[in-house]
Amino acid sequence: MRNEMHLQFSALSQNESFARVTVAAFVAQLDPTMDELTEIKTVVSEAVTNAIIHGYNNDPNGIVYISVVIEDGVVHLTIKDEGVGIANIEEARQPLFTTKPELERSGMGFTIMENFMDEVVVQSEVNKGTTVYLKKYITKSKALCN
């Protein structure tokens, strides 16, 4: 069965936790493990924070878009902004790379996404925005039977 939800919100840092909890609540219908749910929440936090800080440069007028599609035990997550874009995606995906060292950003966002998700695709165009496509296979819970 297919189920989906779409969310959009202002590019404000306080909305990052809203996005994380909302996506986790939606994905919970698949009965993921706590580790899987934590990984999804972490990835949402990283991608939304990237959109707010890097995509929109903390401009609250920007809008962050999230789509979640659940189908056959797979979570398809899309996080999009219409911000400044990424000039060099390959460089941006390198561990420790950051465009904002003055903010003490770790530069680990994409690395975390790649470690926690089964697939990560980043598409971006300078001055048009960035879209991050993420896929996670949820393992079937093994309930104890008496």
From Swiss-Prot:
Belongs to the anti-sigma-factor family. Keywords: ATP-binding, Kinase, Nucleotide-binding, Serine/threonine-protein kinase, Sporulation, Transferase. It comes from Geobacillus sp. (strain WCH70). Coiled coil: none annotated. InterPro entries: Anti-sigma-factor_SerPK, Anti-sigma_F, HATPase_C_sf. The keyword Kinase applies. It is an enzyme of class 2 (transferase). Binds to sigma F and blocks its ability to form an RNA polymerase holoenzyme (E-sigma F). Phosphorylates SpoIIAA on a serine residue. This phosphorylation may enable SpoIIAA to act as an anti-anti-sigma factor that counteracts SpoIIAB and thus releases sigma F from inhibition. This is Anti-sigma F factor. One of its GO terms (molecular function) is sigma factor antagonist activity. Its EC number is 2.7.11.1. Disulfide bonds: none annotated. The lineage of its organism: Bacteria, Bacillati, Bacillota, Bacilli, Bacillales. The gene is spoIIAB. One of its GO terms (biological process) is sporulation resulting in formation of a cellular spore.
